[in-house]
Amino acid sequence: MTPWFLYLIRTADNKLYTGITTDVERRYQQHQSGKGAKALRGKGELTLAFSAPVGDRSLALRAEYRVKQLTKRQKERLVAEGSGFAELISSLQTPEIKSD
């Protein structure tokens, strides 16, 4: 299983873009070259502010959604300290269902 990553990219006007990928460096280069998300095109210099492995695609999609719901201040705390990231991921993981 290919691991998925959550990443945040900072734009020149200090906004944070959140995305997921299996290859952070490749995806960052796509954004830099204008071949990534439309939201980042023409936004000036981009910097990779944060990235972390999150598990499978399903978990990555849930983590991306949850991070996009955070306030700017909470995202900045995540970037600066990784604050709460482990808790966020563990809260998204579904408990295993045991069969008898």
Swiss-Prot record:
SUPFAM superfamilies: GIY-YIG endonuclease
Entry-linked InterPro entries: GIY-YIG_endonuc, GIY-YIG_endonuc_sf, UPF0213_domain, UPF0213_GIY-YIG_endonuc
PROSITE patterns linked: GIY_YIG
Domain GIY-YIG stretches: 2-77
CDD domains in UniProt: GIY-YIG_UPF0213
A matching Pfam family: GIY-YIG
Family: Belongs to the UPF0213 family.
Protein name as it appears in the record: UPF0213 protein YhbQ
Organism: Escherichia fergusonii (strain ATCC 35469 / DSM 13698 / CCUG 18766 / IAM 14443 / JCM 21226 / LMG 7866 / NBRC 102419 / NCTC 12128 / CDC 0568-73)
Gene name as annotated: yhbQ
